[in-house]
Amino acid sequence: VFDNLDAALEADKIRTQLGLKAFIDECNHILQDEIGKSVRIDIRYRRPYSIWRDMEDKQCDFRNVPFKHYVRVLFDPLAIEQETGQYLSEIDIALKIYAIFVSRFKEQCGSFVNYATVPKENNYRALHFRVLGNHGIIEEIHVSSVKWREQATYGCLVESREAWMSRLT
């Protein structure tokens, strides 16, 4: 089953490649104009197990599983402050990025999910929302800071590293 899903995901990547590249290029251009060059955008593809679970839950085939990928927007508040000379909190930057997206693209009604102020159990923090791209496809966007990603991935190791580094300075 998972080998078939891997092959289907690869085919889907090829099929959506041009539209996604155009969307990412446009988003990069918009965010660089509004915030600066330190914001990174990439595409994250869901794992076969995650897609299989959706297929089972929704009783559908691969073609009918929505959002096989999402657009990840990562930012570093310190780099943004150095670039712009203006301090903004992580929440302020995430909300500013959200505002930029929904002012340029039509937001899917009811798609906004705030994990930034109410993190998941694993301390995952981000803003999730969906917009209609200019190529006619709804794209799911996840906005988070580099620190939020590290905390969700490495947990207490990040916090203890920061405490250790603060003792050294």
Model segments located where?
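Nucleic-acid processing machinery
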Residues: 1-169
